[in-house]
């Protein structure tokens, strides 16, 4: 039977080792990032969610607007790859399977890019972007989140929080899990 102090020593040592090995550096900003989860796993999950969105959401039948979105996206893809090549860095989008959809919803003024390059634009944002340049700015912003691997960071932080909560629960003899929620 392991005592609590020994548990904390082992857990703390393992946690520190894991955190140090999971630290990486963002290629452009040189900001430190925590990446505990494999990107391929997150990309796979995102692709499944994206396919579900495509099946359950009303997609726009405006082929001209969708084509414009795809052309802008293609130019951004090329720009990202060219930039990383120009600074001799590995292209973080090399394994992306880019795909674009236009969701028919004029009330939602948004766009998003999932890990792996799955991009959705809501028709509602088009009245705000006004033209190709405005749309490119919005799409570039969303794609930048995927390029910077923000989803991997968020998922890693959530994992740390869950593991930390479980460890505290073990250390406190179940005080967290036995707390009644109102």
Pin down the residues of each PLM region.
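A Zn2+-metalloprotease active-site environment signal
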Residues: 1-182
């Amino acid at each position: 039977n392991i005592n609590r102090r020994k548990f904390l020593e082992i857990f703390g040592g393992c946690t520190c080792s894991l955190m140090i090995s999971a630290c990486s550096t963002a290629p452009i900003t040189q900001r430190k990032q925590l990446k505990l989860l494999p990107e391929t796993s997150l990309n796979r999950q995102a692709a499944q969610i994206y396919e579900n969105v495509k099946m359950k959401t009303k997609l726009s039948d405006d082929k001209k607007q969708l084509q414009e979105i795809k052309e802008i996206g293609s130019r951004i893809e090329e720009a990202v790859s060219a930039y990383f090549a120009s600074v001799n860095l590995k292209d973080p989008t090399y394994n992306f399977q880019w795909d674009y959809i236009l969701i028919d919803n004029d009330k939602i003024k948004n766009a998003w890019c999932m890990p792996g390059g799955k991009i959705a634009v809501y028709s509602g944002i088009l009245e705000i972007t006004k033209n190709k340049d405005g749309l490119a700015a919005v799409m570039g912003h969303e794609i930048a989140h995927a390029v910077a691997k923000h989803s991997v960071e968020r998922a890693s932080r959530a994992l740390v929080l869950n593991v930390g909560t479980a460890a505290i629960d073990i250390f406190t003899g179940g005080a967290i899990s036995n707390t009644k929620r109102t």
